[in-house]
């Protein structure tokens, strides 16, 4: 009779152990999924911040980021268009450099 109690306690402990491992793995999966979501969000806004231009203009100073509007490159120059292409460049005096 004592041995059956021992096995029941052992079975209960094993079940708790398995449940603990299951929930630990589940929480790790959720955390890594959240990190992946943050990474995708970061990638989706890439390019919206000005570049660091300090070393991009060779020896020319001051080298500053400039948002270049390339609307004129397209045939329809309609100002009512909600989207028009822009590009960040580094500019120093009258020279332009790629960031």
Curated annotation (Swiss-Prot):
Q: Which InterPro entries match?
A: EPFL
Provide the disulphide bond pattern: 53-90, 57-63, 60-92
Q: Which segment of the chain is annotated as a signal peptide?
A: 1-35
Q: Which UniProt keywords apply?
A: Developmental protein, Disulfide bond, Secreted, Signal
A Pfam family annotated for this chain is EPF
Q: Name one GO biological process term.
A: guard cell differentiation
> So what does this one do?
Controls stomatal patterning.
- Give the matching PANTHER family: EPIDERMAL PATTERNING FACTOR-LIKE PROTEIN 4, EPIDERMAL PATTERNING FACTOR-LIKE PROTEIN 8
Its protein name is EPIDERMAL PATTERNING FACTOR-like protein 8
């Amino acid at each position: 009779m004592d041995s059956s109690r021992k096995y029941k306690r052992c079975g209960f402990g094993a079940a708790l152990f398995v449940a603990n491992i299951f929930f630990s793995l589940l929480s790790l999966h959720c955390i890594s999924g959240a990190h992946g979501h943050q990474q995708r969000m970061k990638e989706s806004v890439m390019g919206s911040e000005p570049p660091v231009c300090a070393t991009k203009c060779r020896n020319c100073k001051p080298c500053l980021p400039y948002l270049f509007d390339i609307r004129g490159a397209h045939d329809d120059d309609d100002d009512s268009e909600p989207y028009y292409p822009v590009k960040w460049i580094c500019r120093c005096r009258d020279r332009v450099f790629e960031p």
